[in-house]
Amino acid sequence: MPQQVRLSRENSVKRSRSLTKSFRGLFKFNSPGSPPSSAATSDSSEMSGAQGGRGNGLLGGRTKKASISPKSEAQFTQRNKSAESVVSDEGVAMVASAGAQFYGRGKHESSPNVLMTGGEEAARAAGRASAESIALSEGGPPSIDTKLERVTPSLIYPQNGRAKHSSQRSRSASVGRNKERGGPTPAPIGSIREEESKKAHKCIIQQEHFTVDENGNHQHSLKVLPLIVQDPESHKPKLFSFSAVFKSHKNGEDEELSDAFSILPDYSTVLEKTLVEPLSEVKIFSEAAQPDENGGRTEANQPKDMPKIVNKHAAIGNEELKLINNLSETIHVGMQGPDKHSSPPQPFTCKATKSKQVLAEKYGKCIGMIGQGAYGTVWVTCRSLPQDNQTETHYPTETYERNGKLFYAIKEIKPRADEPNEKFSTRLTSEFVIGHSLSGGAGGTKRLTSHPNILKVLDLMQAHDVFIEVFEFCPSGDLFSLLTRSSKTGSGLHPLEADCFMKQLLNGVRYMHDHGVAHCDLKPENILFTPNGTLKLCDFGSSSVFQTAWEKRVHFQTGAVGSEPYVAPEEFIPKREYDTRLVDCWSCGIIYCTMVLGHYLWKIAIKEKDQIYSAFLDDMTTRGEYYVFENMRHVNQEVNRCRKMCLYNIFQWDPKKRITIPKLLDTPWMRRTKCCVNYRAAI
C-alpha cells in the first residue's frame, strides 16, 4: 500500500497572478464561441512546460467511466437497510441508531476520541430504527438510486442507463454578519442556527471541538487564539498562533503601522478631480471626460467606447475598473515618489472634508503578530466599539467582537527585493479589488451583497513604502492548523463535521463562480474559521476573473496555479486551456478527503511523479473503484453511498466528465447535510 502523504505548508506551485492575466479577455468582444486562445500564459506556465514530458502521458490513453462499486445493486440493497440519515432534510432520525451503526463495526481507528452516552437507550433505538427501515424498504418511499437519478443528472453511474435530466434550483447565499454579541437576538441569515427549543438534548457524539445531540443537531466549539482571550492590554508574546509563530509587536513597527492611512477614494464627498489615466492595457475613459458639479459625469462627457454591461452579477464591473485605475496610480506614485518616507500625493482630493483617519484611529492598536511569510506579515488590531453614533463607514463593525472590543486582521505587504514596482502594483491591486468586490465593496463600489463564507476585505492603507490590507478577523485560525491538531490523535475530522465544512466551502466557491471569479488556490491554509464553525475563504491573490460584467462567455486559462496536492491534473498539461471552475471543484474534493483522512490523497496529480496518484488512475481504469473511497465510513450507509458517488464524480481526471459545484450542492449528500449556516433560497 502506498505511503500516506503528510500535511505540509511547503507545496506551493504559484502564489500570485498578474492583474492583466487575471483579467485576460477583458474588452475582447468576439462573437460567442470556443474559449479564446492565449498567447500569454501565467508565470507558472514555464514550470508546467518543464514538466511537459511528464504531463503528456497523464492519462496513458486509457479512460473509463468511474463506477461506485463493482458489486451489484441487488447486493447493496439487501445490506443497506439502515435508519433514515441523521442529516436528512426530510426528517431528523435517531442519531443513537446511526451512531450505534457507525461505531458498532468495532473500534474504528479513525475516531479514538469519540465518547458515546446512553448505551442501552441507543441499542433500543437501533432496534426500532432497523424495524422501521425494513418496513420502508417493503413499500416505502423511493430508493436512494431513484433520488440520485432525479436530482443529479451529471453523475456517472455504473449502469448503462443514463440519468434523466432535471432543472437546477436557483439558490443564492444571503447576507449575514458574524458577530458574537451578547443577548438573545434572532439569528440573521448566514449566522449560526438558533435552537428551536431550549430543552437540553443528550449528547451522543462528543469531541474536543465538535458535538452532536440526539436530534442530529451539531455544534462547533473551535479554540480561540489566546492572544484574544486574554486582556489585549496585557498580552504576552509566548502563545499559540495560526501558523505556530507568535511575536509581540515592536514599538517601531507599531508606530509605523499606526500612521497608515486609507488610500481608497471617499465616495461620500464631492470630488475636485478624478483619475482619468487608465491601465495601459485598457483605454476606456475619454481624456475630455470631466465630472459635473455633482461629482458625476454628464451625458456629453460619458466615457467613450464603454462596453455594454451584459453580466450585472459579475464581481468586476465599471466601478471596480475605476477603483483599479485609482489604486494602480496611487500605488505607483507611492513606490516611485522622490521621498518614500513622505506621504504620497492622493489622486482624489475633497472639498471641506475631514482628513483621512490613520490606522490607529480607525482600527485600533496592534496587539500581536499571528503570521509571517514571503508575501507579508499579518497582525491583529483591537479597538473599542464605536461610540457617539459613529457609523460603519468610518468604523467597520463586520468583524469578530469580544467583550465590547472589535478585532481586525491587517496584512503588511512590501515588494520583494527582486520584484519590480509595476509587478507589485498589479499584484496588490488584483488581490485587493477582487476580495473587496466579493465581500460587498464599500461606498461607490458596493454593488454585491456579502456572503457568510467569504472573508470581508475592508480597507487598503499605506504607511510610507508599506501597504496594508485590512480584513475581518477570524480568531480560530485556519483549517490547516485544525487538521494538524486532529492528526496528532491519529484521525481526521468527524464525518458530520467534515460534511458541514464541505457544504460551507462549496457555497462560498459557488458564490465566487456566480460572480465570475474562480479562487484557483483552494487549500486548508486559505480557509479560516470563527469559533462557532463559520468557514471563510480568503487570499484572492491567485484568483482568476473568468467573466467580467462586459463578457457574455467564459474564458479559460493555461498554466498550473496553486499548491501541488490540490492542483487538478489538467493544469499540468502544457499550453492546455482549462475551466477554472472545474479546477476549484477538484480542489474542494481534495480538501474534503484531507479533512476526513487527516492526510493528502497524493502529493501531485502527475502519474509519472506520484506513485499514489498513479495507483489511483490504474485502479479506476481497471476496476472502476478506488480503495480509499471504498473504505471511507459515515454514520449512515445511504449517505456514505451518496458521498462515495460524489467523490468519484469530483475526481474525474477528464474535466469534461467532472461534476460542477452547483450540481454537487444539489446531490442528496449535500442536501441532506446539516449545515450550521443558514442559506436563503432565491426563487
From Swiss-Prot:
Q: Name one GO molecular function term.
A: protein serine kinase activity
Which taxonomic lineage does the organism of this UniProt entry have? Eukaryota, Fungi, Dikarya, Ascomycota, Saccharomycotina
Q: Does the keyword Lyase apply?
A: no
The biological processes this protein is annotated with in GO are: intracellular monoatomic cation homeostasis
- Pfam families assigned: Pkinase
Chain residues that bind ATP: 370-378, 411
What is the residue range of the signal peptide feature?
A: none
Which family does the similarity line name? Belongs to the protein kinase superfamily. CAMK Ser/Thr protein kinase family. NPR/HAL subfamily. HAL5 sub-subfamily.
Q: Which reaction does it catalyse?
A: L-seryl-[protein] + ATP = O-phospho-L-seryl-[protein] + ADP + H(+); L-threonyl-[protein] + ATP = O-phospho-L-threonyl-[protein] + ADP + H(+)
Which region ranges are annotated with the description Disordered? Answer: 1-90, 157-200
Under Enzyme Commission nomenclature, its number is 2.7.11.1
Which InterPro entries does its entry note? Answer: Kinase-like_dom_sf, Prot_kinase_dom, Ser/Thr_kinase_AS
| Segments of skewed composition (Polar residues) | 69-85
Biased composition annotated in UniProt, kind: Low complexity: 36-48
Domain (Protein kinase): give its ranges.
364-670
What SMART domains is this protein classified in? S_TKc
Q: Would you tell me the protein name for this molecule? A: Probable serine/threonine-protein kinase HAL5-like
- Biased composition regions of type Gly residues, renumbered to the chain: 50-60
Active-site residues annotated for this sequence: 521
